[in-house]
């Protein structure tokens, strides 16, 4: 899988020695730029856009997101609580499986409660009725599986054969659709407009019988709308048509697009050596700080990586004991010397939310930088207590 990182933007001129190591640095100006693009799409197509907290939930940036977007989508109770505490606007909550004891609070916090299957929805009937009787106001949604794989990596494709995510569209019946206020589908991962259009072609016929009933249709995330080469004009016309054809409110819930190219992960070379090729150990760990590097796998782009064969490649790995804790082979400008600072691009989304303390590896600090005014703020740093208190 190839990284979708774009131009380094303002980070090309950022002094890496201004922050701790390891550290995430998020550019507020780039976030505003991304959110403005999403807001422009929203306004032009007359739809709603929610930010997906599963991808980027740095709540220090909630005021920025709230200024531009219509709310957030969450994946279960804890994200819904976070949304209620820090974010403005609507809250749409989906989970592959809700725990019954958590559902009442989910209903209280959410505007949309989206179930993964009709069975879950049916078992929750009494809870939903009690919640509404107590004055809670929410819509009930059903996630459907388009049964139309579009992804590059099967493990990231919700329509992969045997997927547990969403109810297969060929099994929908009038009985199942009773009481369903909205339909949700999420079928993309780091993709442009064409896969969305193709997915909608599959979904349209399956849900057309209920167009008069549905209040809203949520087309999920995975849309790389803020990428420079995304077909935004085509998207706007498509969304307009979808709204007119269905008579429903249309939602998008991008995650990566909110924070695309808005963050870097800064690290330091701790040691170097040679074992058939140059190797370096850094305080950045693939398994602890960037799990997608191993899961996808993919090679993250390095800020200012040297070009040309004159600079030798060095294999950079993390400080954990996992043999496979390898980030990749890179040409480091000026050489891989001990103490050298470096950074990986496009690490705001799906890295910060996945960090862990395996092997006692230190968690990266979190900084918010506004490149428009060169204002840098240490938002959060983690110590031994964080590691200790997650254990018993």
Show the residue positions of the predicted features.
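Short glycine/threonine-rich loop-to-helix capping motif typified by GTGT followed
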Residues: 192-198, 226-237, 262-271, 331-332
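N-terminal capping/small domains of soluble enzymes
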Residues: 10-88, 97, 285, 332-345, ...
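Active-site-proximal beta-alpha core segment in soluble small-molecule metabolic enzymes
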Residues: 47-216, 230, 238
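N-terminal glycine-rich, Lys/His-bearing helix-loop that initiates the first secondary-structure elements
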Residues: 1-12
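Glycine-rich beta-alpha junction loops
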Residues: 144-148, 187-191, 221-223, 256-258, ...
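Acidic, glycine-rich loop-and-beta core segments that form the ion-binding/anion-interacting portion
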Residues: 203-257
């Amino acid at each position: 899988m190839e990284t979708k990182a774009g131009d380094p933007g303002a980070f090309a001129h950022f002094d890496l020695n201004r922050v701790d190591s390891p550290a995430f640095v998020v550019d507020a100006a780039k976030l505003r730029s991304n959110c403005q693009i999403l807001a422009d799409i929203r306004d032009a197509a007359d739809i709603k856009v929610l930010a997906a907290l599963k991808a980027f939930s740095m709540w220090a940036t909630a005021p920025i997101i709230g200024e531009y977007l219509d709310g957030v989508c969450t994946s279960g109770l804890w994200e819904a609580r976070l949304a209620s505490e820090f974010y403005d606007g609507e809250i749409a909550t989906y989970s592959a499986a809700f725990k019954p004891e958590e559902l009442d609070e989910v209903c209280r916090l959410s505007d949309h409660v989206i179930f993964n299957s009709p069975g879950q929805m049916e078992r929750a009937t009494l809870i939903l009725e009690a919640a509404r009787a107590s004055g809670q106001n929410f819509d009930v949604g059903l996630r459907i599986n388009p049964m139309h794989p579009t992804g590059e990596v099967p493990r990231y494709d919700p329509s992969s054969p045997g997927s547990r995510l969403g109810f297969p569209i060929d099994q929908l019946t009038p009985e199942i659709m009773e009481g369903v206020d909205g339909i949700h589908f999420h079928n993309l991962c780091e993709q442009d407009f064409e896969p969305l259009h193709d997915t909608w072609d599959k979904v349209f016929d399956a849900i057309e019988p209920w167009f008069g009933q549905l209040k809203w249709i949520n087309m999920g995330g995975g849309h790389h709308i803020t990428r420079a080469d995304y077909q935004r004009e085509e998207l706007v016309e498509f969304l307009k048509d979808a709204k007119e054809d269905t008579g429903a409110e249309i939602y998008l819930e991008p995650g990566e697009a909110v924070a695309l190219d808005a963050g870097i992960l800064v690290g330091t070379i701790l040691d170097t050596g040679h074992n058939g090729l140059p190797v370096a150990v850094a305080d950045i760990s693939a398994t602890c700080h960037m799990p997608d590097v191993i899961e996808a796998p993919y090679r993250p782009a390095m800020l200012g990586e040297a070009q040309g064969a004159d600079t030798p490649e060095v294999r950079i790995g993390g400080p954990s004991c996992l043999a496979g804790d390898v980030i990749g082979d890179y040409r480091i400008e000026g050489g891989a010397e001990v103490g050298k600072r470096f950074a990986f691009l496009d690490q705001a989304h799906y890295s910060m939310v996945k960090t862990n303390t395996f092997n006692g590896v230190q968690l990266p600090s979190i900084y918010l930088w506004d490149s428009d005014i060169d204002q840098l703020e240490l938002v959060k740093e983690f110590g031994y207590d964080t590691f200790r208190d997650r254990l018993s």
